[in-house]
Amino acid sequence: MNLEIIGQIILATFLGSLIGFEREIKKKGAGLQTFSLISLASCLFTLISFELINLFIEKGQGFDPTRIIQAMAIGIGFVGAGVIFRQGEEVVGLTTAATLLATSAVGVAVGAKLYLLAVFSTFLTLFVLAGFGWLEKKFF
């Protein structure tokens, strides 16, 4: 394992924690730990898929790394479903579930060495959570 991989894992965890911190201070169902771990795991799965490509190429076999990313998205869907609840007529947790999916994508971006995309997406996610939440309360 080289230092770049360690840096990727740390960056993914840090970016996930920024998003998780926002959810934590708003007392949502998933917070700092959950979002940090989602981003970290997504980065790890992406890194592993790239390593598997190299391993399979050496053996003369094909490998499709998008299958691992696809499986992650399905898994995040199950995790996200666990934070969605109905309270009377209101459904709560949809934003947190969607944010879990976005955080997973941030981890994938870091694992794929798309650092600018990962950082930009993290801050755009935070902007949407803060800015759009304010707009919803003010106008809807």
Could you describe each region identified by the protein language model?
Residues 1-59, 66, 115, 119-120, ...:
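Alpha-helical transmembrane segments and their membrane-interface boundaries
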Residues 12-16, 66-82:
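Hydrophobic, membrane-facing alpha-helical anchors
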Residues 37-47, 71, 98-111:
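Small-residue-rich segments of transmembrane alpha-helices in multi-pass membrane proteins
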Residues 65-66, 84-95:
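Short, amphipathic, aromatic/basic-enriched membrane-interface segments that mark the entry/exit
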Residues 76, 137-140:
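Hydrophobic alpha-helical transmembrane segments and immediately flanking/interface helices
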Residues 124-134:
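Alpha-helical transmembrane segments and their membrane-interface exit regions
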Residues 77-87, 106-113, 117-119:
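C-terminal halves and exits of single transmembrane alpha-helices
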Residues 74-78, 95-100:
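Hydrophobic alpha-helical membrane segments
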